[in-house]
Amino acid sequence: FKIALKKVKMLLRKNPEADFISISQNDVPERCHCKNCKALEEKYACSGAPVFWFADKIARAIKDEFPKVAVEILPYVYSDEPPKGLVFSENIAIRFTTMNFCREHQLTDEKCKYNLKQKANLDGFAKLTNNLYIWDYAANFYNYLMPIPQLYSLYWNFRYYMEKGARGIMVQASGASDDGAFDRMWNYALGKLLWEPYMD
């Protein structure tokens, strides 16, 4: 903890304009299975508990020196379930990722049991912070040339994010290829939708 805290403070002192610092898991599907991490997972009833607990500890340690900085956590892949019993510091920001969402249905579609689980996760995180952000996806990362029919679901999901109090939405779309799945049209439509999620 002391090493990470020292590094966080050093980075923030070097970058006084920063509003966020991210304390998040690696971009891999695996996590630590040591006894300490397992104990935190059991205590807070979720796989992301070790990272969330650690980030919260950092947030509490820096809030006096850096009152305008939010410590961002990233519920992602294995850590998309909210912790039970962990009360976050007010300077925690949650950037909820939609990696595990079904792309064919909107989040509130009761016929999609998969998305109803993800909706419950998002709702749970929204209750834990006033600093909710969304990291959404609009690409087929397995094959950039394949279309991904989700504009309709994004349209309704963006509205739902706003209803849950999201302060910002970022969409990771395809940028790897100019000729994949109407990328330029997608980016134009997403830009318009992000600017005005309640458009008709």
Where are the regions that the model predicts?
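Active-site groove signature of glycoside hydrolases
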Residues: 5-41
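Substrate-binding groove of N-acetylhexosamine-processing glycoside hydrolases
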Residues: 13, 41-200
